[in-house]
Amino acid sequence: MSATLVIVDMQKAMDDPRYGKRGQPDAEEKVAALLGHWRELGNPVVHIRDNSLDPESPYAPGRPTHAFKPEVAPLDHEIIVDKQTNNAFIGTDLMQVLEDIGSIELVICGVHMQYCVESTVRMAGNLGFMVFVPQDCVVAVDQTDRTGRHWTAEEVHALQLSILEGSFCKVLNSEDLISANGSETLQ
């Protein structure tokens, strides 16, 4: 079975200014290319949609920003898993979906690196999946820590990927995934 592409929270809400300055300005384009390749090969795709319980959140159902970004929107036959936490496995049927597909390898991309992507990657790794993260297909935003230090989106992106790599996932570029995905395994 080919790897399953899991796209996390690629909704219009990701552009809301309340999340701060974002990095990876080409991420949507890169995810769209990866998604197009997955579709051409007939490989499984799962879209994760944030259904925030906070009615003021741009991710709240019913708000215009709750919609998927058009360039990575799911096709009618593609699976959508709705979540209400920062981890796509908690309180959802994602594990059952992946078991039904027969997935052992996951390619996880989306937003935001330091929140939902990180939580989902960690959980997937802990559950025994072989996880791949295309570094050019995940978006981080600026972060200020409790001491008041400001971290740019680029710094957050690099730090988060370095923390996850090895213990929870393999980090690579989307071009590497596109060229490798025709094989039986990505390893």
State what each model feature region is.
Residues 18-25, 56-59, 148-150:
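Short glycine-enriched, charge-decorated loop/helix-capping segments at active-site entrances
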Residues 13-17:
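Short acidic, Gly/Ser-rich segments with clustered Asp/Glu that frequently serve as metal-coordination loops
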Residues 19-47:
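A short alpha/beta connector and helix-capping loop motif
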